[in-house]
Curated annotation (Swiss-Prot):
Top-level EC class: transferase
GO cellular component: cytosol; riboflavin synthase complex
Stated name of the protein: 6,7-dimethyl-8-ribityllumazine synthase
Enzyme Commission code(s) on record: 2.5.1.78
Binding site for (2S)-2-hydroxy-3-oxobutyl phosphate: 84-85, 126
InterPro entries: LS, LS/RS, LS/RS_sf
Origin species: Thermobifida fusca (strain YX)
GO molecular-function terms, A-Z: 6,7-dimethyl-8-ribityllumazine synthase activity
Amino acid sequence: MSGAGRPEYTVDAQGLTLGVVATRWNAEVVEPMLERALAAAEQCKVAETTVVRVAGAVEIPVVAQELARTHDAVVALGAVIRGDTPHFDYVCQSFTHGLTEVALRTEVPVGNGVLTCDTLEQARDRAGLPDSKEDKGWEAAVAALDTALVLRKLRDARGQRDGRPRPTTT
């Protein structure tokens, strides 16, 4: 099991906002992941969660970028299942690169909860279903919120928030 050894934890994200972008493709896998991501946000005491739907994985990065402008953390959810053509590889490379670019350019963490699996069964096994071995929706949400808190702490320590100098009082 690839999830062996992963930490089970939540964070106190009270006051943080979370943007979630989820695909419509492979709904039987994505919907439970979305439910679990929202449950994680609630347990972490997120102040506000916005959910946006897109067609597929290639559309995720541009919407994640827009969410990053108004949220403390973003989560991307979807499932790309390998087919008989190289399209799978192009899609996976495209959205993965896009999500990394969004996080680096906006300085807002993006939790990657987009499954890239050879089979639907592999995706179901990671979707947080009652019989799943893993819970990638939950994990992606907590990871994004945790990273947002780490960034906030680092920025506060040097007198900055959101990458901008904070005003000093005299």
